[in-house]
Amino acid sequence: MPFALGQRWISDTESELGLGTVVQVEGRMVTVLFPATGENRMFSRNEAPLTRVIYNPGDTVESHEGWSLAIEELTEKDGLVVYHGIHSETGEKASLRETLLNHNIRFNKPQDRLFAGQIDRLDRFGIRYQCQLLRHQLATSDLLGLQGPRVGLIPHQMWIAHEVGRRYAPRVLLADEVGLGKTIEAGLIIHQQLLTGRAERVLIIVPDTLRHQWLVEMLRRFNLRFSVFDEDRCVEAFADHDNPFYTEQLVICSLELLRKKKRLDQALDADWDLLVVDEAHHLEWTEEAPSRAYQVVEALSEVVPGVLLLTATPDQLGHESHFARLRLLDPDRFYDYDAFLAEENSYKDVAVAAEALAGDAKLSDAAINSLTELLSEKDIAPSIRLIQAEDIDSELQQAARSELLQELLDRHGTGRVLYRNSRASVKGFPKRIFNAYPHAMPEQYLTAARVNEMMGGRKTLEAKAAQALSPEKLYQEFEDNSASWWKFDPRVDWLIEFLKSHRSKKVLIIASGADTALSLEEALRTREGIQATVFHEGMSIIERDKAGAYFAQEEGGAQALICSEIGSEGRNFQFASHLVLFDLPLNPDLLEQRIGRLDRIGQKNDIQIHLPYLQDTAQERLLNWYHQGLNAFELTCPSGHVLYSEFAEDLLNVLVGGDEDELTNLLNHTQSRYKELKHAMEQGRDKLLEINSHGGDKAKAIVERLAQSDQDTKLIGSVIRLWDIIGVDQEDKGENSIILRPSEHMMFPTYPGLHEDGVTVTFDRDTALSRDDIALITQEHPLVQTGLDLITGSDTGTTSVAILKNKALPAGTLFLELIYMADASAPKSSQLYRYLPPTPIRVLLDKNGNDLSAKVDYTSFDKQLSAVNRHIGSKLVTASQPILHPLFAKGEEYAQAAVDELVAQAREKMTSQLTGELDRLESLKAVNPNIREEELEYLRNQMQELSTYLNASQLQLDAIRMVLVSHV
């Protein structure tokens, strides 16, 4: 496309932005400023979804100063158009450069198209109106952003997303126990922030090994197209912008990249709205010497308004490390470690009071005294009387308990910045059943161990332990690469027999290294022809996806998936319930990570954990330490990290060559310390935090509403009709799924997101969750949103003529149906749509100008209408022009009255909600320092901005349908 500075263009997909101006043309990119909203958009010059705006003689245009010009002719110079005509205020000849046009000008007036004979098919008018209604319905939903993602409707996840996602610039720590879905919670929050306009630019920092996993997760689950940035990508992007991070809105990168000063400086200068940091517990910090990684995240968290930290539970982190994460979120609030510890001790009284309220029993005197002291600024006596009363409605008592709990949550603890769910507070997890299978140590391994000992060599204790735990690796060091250890290792024989006896079961096998995983696949294939696939760090993301899909396939798929330690990070396989641990990792957290591939919320079966091991070896001793010392196979062990840190040296000595007495002594000490830590964690459980994190009945209510929305057959019908009209080919594939393909008769030349080879979709959430290759279609899905935008952003369905066959009315009776849109140009981030989203207003006029829309509903009226061809329709319009012109003026009067009422309601709702929230937060700030001043300032500014935008609300005629009565 030929672009020049100052040219005026309109966005095909975001027409609400108004008239745009080209402000930069550089390399392959063009930047357009939309003055109505103050927003910039950067597009690829070759594929920009933009339409050039050039008016014709006879049109009237408005200047940015407010005067109009009746165009008589136009000229072009240096790619810019100059309009010449008559000035509306002076009546003299004048010229107007296109750069000085009013940016709020609306385009393609339906009445102009109607009188020009550009008449659309009847069904297109209907689908346009349905599209406007769907957009309004979505914009007004308080669950916006929660329905679209391809995730299970799990209460605590939806609750956290609902609470955090609707905040301005949320700064929170997501610290759920392993398996409870922190990544999904973060994705839901990101999705909601983007969809509502609270955020536009997002940076996700993850460990290097998880970059592509996050990329796939964001795309498959949330339909968010992130870009992975590494050094090569930064160098390549330099051609388009001095700062590579400005070339994309959604970016994933590793901490390694940002350790480089140049890249960190660029990231700091990139105006992110939201920063997400995964595995934040690896950021080491002490007051005297914070790590480089911690300093990188700290620098970013100081300039990025919203921050999400995904981390291990506070129990696993230890107090100082937990404080370090909170300090990143709010350094003013968490400024001193000793002060933090003192405050934490005061939470115990709050926890006792919360536990009393969360139960059903009468409150003790101690609990009442504690509540009275904690909520001293509020009169809680009426609520206490309700709770203590004998003969009173249980719902009233429960409401009183809930109200006091909410007061505690608002005023005390870290509930606004920390969310931590535990398995103790979230139900729905399966049992873990441990099965161990002893085998004799092969002579070949014993020989390799003796040779290794004779050769000596300096090795750390940890390296020696690693060798002892994986004898097959040591054996291969002394044999050539083709040495087939799997031909004599009894664990391999056991594995083959196990798979043969469980033919119908999917089995996940995890080994420590990629070489071991590849050798096992070779053994299964060559010895028994067992269908297995591998999954390791040497494979590309596409290869791993294919392996995962092959394993997930029910018919004709692999029976077993063999993963390496690193290769399995971040991947979950809940559809399998058998886990074979071919060896054991040295770290309890890695063991939990392995089991966590299956032991996740949503797993429907008990998990069978199988461990073949070699007797009288380091493998057996480590098994005993995990099983007898930590009970780590059958239960999660939040204290595993602490216990390993404390007993690592003793454990390594036992593994490398300790005797039975040393092992017994280690087990006794470990068991004793395990019980101490478990008791301390139980005592220190923050009941208030748990209640706030899982959401209770409120979370269940959100999930019930989302489930009802999934079953909305009316919505499904509207979406299918939309695709029919656009020309999308739909092939029923069975199993609740449809294949969508562009047909030869597409209404639009391109349909972003719909590929030539098609896409498989479903309206059923369970089907989508069981198949990675099937997209879940909801109102929020890009394929639906794009379809709505294509229709409403074009002139499709803006004019129509129909016949009403009704002998009760005189032949020739005329009705004029007008669809207006009430809206205002405002940045998405202003949240104006919460109060005045683009709203369709229907007016149905008879020939006398009476509005019948309240008496004649759209659906029943539409069913009685018949289409006419364009030629006849054009003649009917021409013949009816004398009647139509005054009706348009009358229709606008009715619509304007409706808009005035909508604006008044929007203003009242906005003032009520924001004033109420501001008053609440201001009063809470006096007793809870977790309320940030930025949040209060944001609310004050938002009220002023929204009031200005509401004053500038506009009425636009969107579609016209002329209806004539016929008896033929």
From Swiss-Prot:
Enzyme class per UniProt: hydrolase
Domain Helicase ATP-binding: 163-332
Gene3D superfamilies: 2.30.30.140, 2.30.30.930, 3.30.360.80, 6.10.140.1500, 6.10.140.2230, P-loop containing nucleotide triphosphate hydrolases (3.40.50.300), Tandem AAA-ATPase domain (3.40.50.10810)
CDD domains (UniProt xref): DEXDc_RapA, SF2_C_SNF
Keyword vocabulary terms for this entry: Activator, ATP-binding, DNA-binding, Helicase, Hydrolase, Nucleotide-binding, Transcription, Transcription regulation
Domain of life assignment: Bacteria
Known EC number: 3.6.4.-
This protein's name: RNA polymerase-associated protein RapA
Organism listed in the record: Shewanella sp. (strain MR-4)
Gene behind the chain: rapA
